[in-house]
Amino acid sequence: MSSGGLLLLLGLLTLWAELTPVSGKNRPEFCNLPADTGPCKAYEPRFYYDSVSKECQKFTYGGCKGNSNNFESMDECRKTCVASATRRPT
């Protein structure tokens, strides 16, 4: 295979890995924790995975402590915790 073909294959595999959602079996345990603002009083918009709705939701983080179900962006939350409802086992 030519180096151009290998480069294309590598690019496609990288894209596939980025776009493939996390399966429920592989979802980190902390994704099931509730949103936790923590004891501090800052106002930081953040996102958490809501295991009931199975979607990432916005919440206000106080700036300290809390838990690991706390993401700076919706995209980061989705990449880490959202499982695809349409994904079929292989």
Curated annotation (Swiss-Prot):
GO MF assignments: serine-type endopeptidase inhibitor activity
Domain BPTI/Kunitz inhibitor: residue ranges: 31-81
Pfam families, sorted: Kunitz_BPTI (PF00014)
UniProt note on tissues of expression: Expressed by the venom gland.
Localization, UniProt: Secreted
Site (Reactive bond for trypsin): 41-42
Keyword Electron transport tagged: no
Matching SMART domains: KU (SM00131)
GO cellular component, one term: extracellular space
Disulfide cross-links: 31-81, 40-64, 56-77
Keywords noted in UniProt: Disulfide bond, Protease inhibitor, Secreted, Serine protease inhibitor, Signal
Signal peptide: 1-24
Family under the similarity heading: Belongs to the venom Kunitz-type family.
PANTHER family: BPTI_KUNITZ INHIBITOR DOMAIN-CONTAINING PROTEIN, KUNITZ-TYPE PROTEASE INHIBITOR-RELATED
Function: Serine protease inhibitor.
The protein's name in its UniProt record: Kunitz-type serine protease inhibitor bitisilin-1
Organism phylogeny: Eukaryota, Metazoa, Chordata, Craniata, Vertebrata
